[in-house]
């Protein structure tokens, strides 16, 4: 390759490696930084968990040097006490991942107090005057503790000898040795006894040749159900199976989506939950692009194996979490358009007719915002009798607080009483503009999205618009406080309208909508996005000559592809994107995710991959584009960004590439995250300045 195509590299103050020229007249970065730093406001809380008896609340909140656990009576959160493994009150540790004991008399949690910043271990607090007990001596990555129903054991996920957090979002290890064989890190289910006389290594339950992603105890505490796949775990979640295993026994596969017939064939499964009688396992199943971003239908399968049953087929929502109330009833947390809601699903079994029918109650609550307890996506914390659900919630306009939904009856009519439990952020106002939910028609679909207005919006002025596309694609933008690495609140505070669409392929409108972009990346979904821009321009004072596009991951792909399909965007910022699906197939650490979307491997059907590759249409690109990526990104590897930047530069299109050392797909260094947003703001301000 010619030396003329590359400039000398230089690190900026954040440690990022920048390639190519800066726009001719860069805006004042100090003023942008001042605005961005002013966005950090409000009290940040993490996981929240109600005790099984419904009387106490435990939660995580940020503290000096880490995170701490607080416990309080549900009726009066002001009377909270710190629960900690710290040896002195002034010692600050990182403590998180809560689990209540079934009798509500103890908390299990992870803490790094013994070796601050180095290793977390499992601890047990009986919430009395007795010292907190350390249960384990671990060396590796841990998460997701869960008490056995009899309270005698705590199971958790453990990567022994881990060099990095589990999952594809974390920075990948530098390649070395036999790829795919040497140094593969396997996540297993481990169990520690609560009455252990002294800390020690846990019992490894799941086999060493299976990577476990999530699990659930059987009601008799004798077995586990878990979702697992052959290593390497980062790549194989998309072909994972459902297993059961007796403690001390062998793993038994009860469901393999790749082998079943019907609508679950070849798709993904998540959130396994054992029924109270131990006969059935419920789970979420459907087309999912990322582990942890859960959406689909509610399914059940016999704990002994057999054909799975879809309990919510055709429902125009995306289930994300579930929990059994009885053997015939499930609570389901789901995304419905722009709302998060909790519903009850009834299962009616006619043994004589050999049929199963399901009915859905009206939502127990439906909120135009985010809900969750900090464990899984849209998961809730429930009392043992399921009369109380606790969660944290926020919107674009309201910071997060804890809430309780209490179920009751009056004259045989079921009622829900919702109560705000916390007031961490009372009086905190957003430093950005108001947000509204929009819907528009595209082809045969009704598409939903969110529009955030500029701070100090004046209807008499014309404004620029930035379109921010979410990742996934099987995900959804939900109204929530704050922003991501490319932040709608930040762009709003700087004077832009921001449109965040949920095009086809997103969660929130059922499996048909989620699957509507298969073999069609960049076409129908781009039409949905452009139709959303049309809607915004028709209803709000948008300057059509100042419309930009940005996004991360799948949103980064969409940014790269869109600028080769239309000249509508005046500037673009592509974060961790994909420019060439054919080369990407052989570069990434997660190639299994593409088969359900493209229908075949790139070696069997290269044309369907080329159809959606920006690089194949690069001669049509004219939009100035900033590209950013981490040098250890395994999901969307840096060569994809290099390839796109190189092609634009060769075509004399204004372009810049910034590579961040040590970062994976999800950036963790605060300085890098801030630098990405500052550079994006500068880029847009140069080519389409705010009013």
Question: Residue locations for each model-derived region?
Answer:
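Beta-strand-rich domains and repeat architectures in extracellular enzymes and scaffolds
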Residues: 35-68
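Serine-hydrolase catalytic core recognition
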Residues: 327, 377-691
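A short helix->beta-strand "capping" segment at the edge of beta-propeller domains
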Residues: 23-45, 199-205
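Hydrophobic beta-strand positions that form the internal "hydrophobic ladder"
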Residues: 54-57, 107-108, 151-154, 224-225, ...
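Residue-level detector of Asp-centered blade-edge/turn motifs that repeat once per structural unit
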Residues: 52-53, 102-103, 149-150, 219-220, ...
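Short loop/turn segments that connect beta-strands within beta-propeller blades
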Residues: 73-77, 126-130, 193-198, 246-250, ...
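A flexible loop/linker signature enriched in serine peptidases of the S9 family
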Residues: 42, 61-70, 87-95, 108-123, ...
